[in-house]
Amino acid sequence: MQKTYLLALLVSSLASVRSLADQTRLDLGGSFDSTDSADGGSDNVMIQKSEMNEVIASSELLSLHRSLVEIKSISDNEQAVGEFLIDYLDSKNFTVEMQYVDFDDDTGKTIRSPRRFNIFAYPGNNASPGIILTSHIDTVPPFIPYSLSHPASTSLKRDDILISGRGTVDDKASVACQVIAAMDHLEKHPDIPIGLLFVVSEEVGGKGMSTFSNSRLNSGTYHTIIFGEPTEGALVAGHKGMVSFTLRVHGKPAHSGYPWLGRSAVSEIIPILAEVDRLGDIPVSQGGLPSSEKYGRTTLNIGFMSGGVASNVVAEEAVAKVAVRLAAGDPEDAKDIIFRAIRNVATKNRNDATVVLSNGHERPKGDIEIIFGLEAYGVIDLDSDVDGFNVTTVNYGTDVPHWKIYGDNVKRYLYGPGTIFVAHGKNEALTVGEMEAGLEGYKKLVAKAVERERP
């Protein structure tokens, strides 16, 4: 009797739980079948784990983002994602122009190939819009598949669904948000054209944006350019400049048992790199790199180093690659400071050391070569005059300096969902809430640009 009663009680309890779950089921429109569930409205409703895919599929923004992320588009291999985006924009009645972008091989030779291209889209025949939204469609390696997850609970807020995968943040979140923001704008203001520019190769030198900038498509008729990068939803008032260089030291090989018969390139490069590493901490008056109140100090990163062939051979060559994030000053002045610092250390350790500038492709003319990268620019100041945003500065580089601006009255904004802190990592991800807030941010920036179109 007692067992029968307990069994009946258990069945009744399970039925109640199932009924409650049914009452709080999220429909495809993002709202509840029952009013018992509320906790902040349709943007913040509670859902079940099995409904995450439905949330994505029911949203034009989120489903476009998923399609973009699911397509592998590591730099120099953006063809597939570009073709998808062209088809998508064409289906939304945009006029789409495809611009092929050459690439340089390891020797510096320019290779023409159809495997990557920029995309420039605009409504109808309005090929010279006053407002342009732009982001990049390439990603860093390796490819990480698209996935959805959630906090460790049986249910969660819709906004908290975590979207993971390579490019979810950098930069396909901005691409998706910009497309939907442009469509929303054209629905409200069909008489004010808006352009979409999606470029390749941002992660490897900016060849895509440079190609656009030097082409007929860069008509100079725009008054507002909105660049997309992960800024955590803040407007960026500027970012640091950039100088990069390769340091190559040539030694003389010998048997390690008789090191005095050779000259170790590794032994010579170590003290040089130690000095280079501290240039951002040394005052300019003492030979260091400049700092500023807005951007802080200049930082250097020795990101790559190799040398020698075996432990029992005196190293004949050593190589290091360094990235410099400039907080102030002219990049050419920074190059001079770096050159002098390297020469001073090299000649202090060995009187007959010869330090030379090189393009990296010719026969070396000195013991120590400094090969500065082609990309070099000073700090980039940007506009941040739109109310309702936090304002910040960032340390990373963008395509902004690669776009040649015509005229003095062009507003340049940098904005996007997600954080740069996960952008190139294994944990690259952002939430549904961040994506949808990003879309609203772009809409706000476009609305401000419309005011400039219609004073």
Curated annotation (Swiss-Prot):
Cofactor binding: number and manner: Binds 2 Zn(2+) ions per subunit.
| Database matches in Pfam families | M20_dimer (PF07687), Peptidase_M20 (PF01546)
Give a GO cellular-component term. Answer: extracellular region
- From which domain of life does this come? Eukaryota
Q: What is this protein called?
A: Probable carboxypeptidase MCYG_07204
Q: Where does Zn(2+) 1 bind?
A: 170, 203
Which keywords does UniProt give here?
Answer: Glycoprotein, Hydrolase, Metal-binding, Protease, Secreted, Signal, Zinc
Write down the EC number. 3.4.17.-
Family classification:
Belongs to the peptidase M20A family.
A Gene Ontology MF term for this entry? peptidase activity
Organism lineage: Eukaryota, Fungi, Dikarya, Ascomycota, Pezizomycotina
Q: Which GO terms describe its biological process?
A: proteolysis
Binding positions for Zn(2+) 2 per the UniProt entry: 170
Leader sequence residues:
1-21
- Cofactors per UniProt? Zn(2+)
